[in-house]
Every structure is written in C-alpha cells, then in structure tokens.
C-alpha cells in the first residue's frame, strides 16, 4: 500500500530570508532554496526569520517569527487584536506606504494582465484610517471552555472567532460595542444557535440583524428589545433568508440613510442592502466619477451594476437621462424608490443578469454618450460584448478587483479601440490589501 496523502512535517526551525517585494495580497515575497515564499507579516527590504505554514512544489507560505532588520515603513499596529484578527492585514505598514502598495499593485495588474498602461494617474482618494467601516458581518460563538460568548471577526485563515473587546476600524457605534454585543448574546437561551450579526450604520440610525437558527423565546425577545432601547439601536432577527428579517426593536422597521449634499440626494436602505462600507471615500468616489464622466444635460448615460442608485441619482442631476441596470430585483426596487423620494424623474431602471447579455432587454442595444461600470469582483467581462452597441465616447470603470479591471481594460483597449486615459486607487479599506480603483477610457 502506498503512502499517498501523507504529508511531510513542515520544518520547525525558523529560516532566514530577505523580503524582495509585495505580493498582490500584501504578503512579502522572498526566495528560499529556489522557491518563491509568501511571508505573512513581512515588508519589502526587511531581513526576517520565518516558519513555513505551507510548502508546495512551486511555492511556499510562511509567517514572520522575527524582524531582524525593519523597513522604515513599518509602524506599530494600533489594534491589540491585530496579530490574530483576519479583519486587517496591513496595520504594521505606514499609511503612505499602504497607498503606494495599492498603486503599485494596480499598475502591475494593468501591465501583466491587460497589457495596458494609463496615460496618467489620479491622486489617490484618502479618508479616515480608523472608525471608517460602517458595515460588517461579525461572527458569534459561545465557547464553553471559556465560559463566555465571542463576537468579532475570524482569525487569519481560520473559522475561529477572535476573542476581541473592541475594533478600531469599525464605526464607533459598532467597534466600541463588541463587548456589549457578546454580553447580550451570552444571556440569550439560543446563544449557541446564533452564528452571526449583520451590522450597518446610517447617518441617523444603526441596525443589527441577529442571525438565529431557532426561534427566540419570549425572554430572548425581551432582552433583545431592551438592549436596542438602552443602546439606541435598531434590532432585528433573521431566522432564514432575507425575507425572514423581522424587527424586534422598534416594533416597526425603519430605513437607514446616507446623504450626498453636493448632489442633493438622500439614499434610504435596509440593514442587509449593499452599500459601500466607507462613507467618506464613497462621497469622494462619487465626486470623482462625476468629474470623470462629466455628464451633460443633453446626454444619455448608462450605469451598469447600479445597486440602489449610488451613482445613478447623482448622474441624473446632471445628465439628460440615465439608465440604471442591476441584477438584484430588491436593489432595483430600492433604487426606484430612492429616485422617487428625491424627485428624480429622468431615470429608468432594469433588472438584468449582466453575466448573460443575451438575456438583457432593449436597453443593451441602445446608444449612450457615456457608460459607467461598477461590477463585483468578477468584473464586467460578459457585458463588454455589448460595447459596440453603445457607441459611447467615454467609459468610466469603478473596480474592487484590479485583476479583473486589468483584464477588462485589455479588452476595451485592444478589441474596442479605447484609450486608457487615467486610473487611480481609492483607499476604501485601509489596513487591508483590498484595492478599490477607477479607470477612464475614451475613443
């Protein structure tokens, strides 16, 4: 019988290495014994010792044991939970160096994947590095060995929940209440049947949706309602899918909201609706998109992956007509209500699966002066086949994944004759390697 499936034990002794550069996820890259090693916790230019966490034929992974020679960009991590928590990965890197890393990653992806280069770069959009995150999914677990409830993010590469008391990157309405959330759940009968909390902060209200795997008791409901009242929070429970979300306190559900005063728009949204997590950057991002697209009163604009209208409604304040398209019917219904609430009539919205252009409606065959794309991480590959129909002179692409942006940029440039005029990063997620970016194409 063979020994297939048996793994050699990883070397236990720390190994010396010089860190040469960054990987796309913010890990340091070194070469040891002819193999690329991705070292978690290491910065370019540093001499470190590390231990292996994984060894494959072509590459390996490891984590830092000791920083022998530190980078001048290294700073002390502010959060006491940083070493364990998977919510952040770059707190030990200075703020300026984080921005530079993201700019380098974006340009590298353009060159390697899209074989394109922007003619110019936008200055990076920057905002608060702490207390910025207004939406989060927090894990919850009662740990019998500890005799208490844990609430927070997962540990690095683990399903375990970090034993945390606070979180400095979360909005204070959430980050300063982590311990209070844990104490609340600890007192519920279903504490072992409550795996997560969806939390969302609006300008006037903060909402918590407790995911429960069994129905709460009358005493549980009373505790949840009392907590909501005492803390000034909207409290919901979710037994199954989104349709099962029900208010506990207040007894009637209330929308959350955020406003864009410059564009005279206020958005209302539910606690499970998708919104950008960083409202300061969101406002700057909208301003930058408006400047880049420069919609005119006589122009028709197409806004794809429009969500609840985050870009659509500001665009409609300047353009002649805006068509918004989104895959989720609930988001489109919300966008229609937001347009009506803001007295905006020069818009239309459609529900369409943008990964299946053949099923899209008549809007996909129309001509538009300008187009905005804001897809998910998978990018806009499929819908790009409709680009010739639109005959747009300018396309602005907002991306949360530089690799799919680079792929799609290559298509726009090499297949459809656009020029990549300008690109830049937006620091939507400080202290992480997540890169939010914008690119402007013209022909």
From Swiss-Prot:
Catalytic residue list: 400 (nucleophile)
Domain TRAM: 8-66
Pfam family, one: tRNA_U5-meth_tr
BP term (GO), one: rRNA base methylation
Family named by the database record: Belongs to the class I-like SAM-binding methyltransferase superfamily. RNA M5U methyltransferase family. RlmD subfamily.
Keyword set, alphabetical order: 4Fe-4S, Iron, Iron-sulfur, Metal-binding, Methyltransferase, rRNA processing, S-adenosyl-L-methionine, Transferase
Gene: rlmD
Organism placement in taxonomy: Bacteria, Pseudomonadati, Pseudomonadota, Gammaproteobacteria, Methylococcales
Catalytic activity: uridine(1939) in 23S rRNA + S-adenosyl-L-methionine = 5-methyluridine(1939) in 23S rRNA + S-adenosyl-L-homocysteine + H(+)
Full protein name: 23S rRNA (uracil(1939)-C(5))-methyltransferase RlmD
Species of the source: Methylococcus capsulatus (strain ATCC 33009 / NCIMB 11132 / Bath)
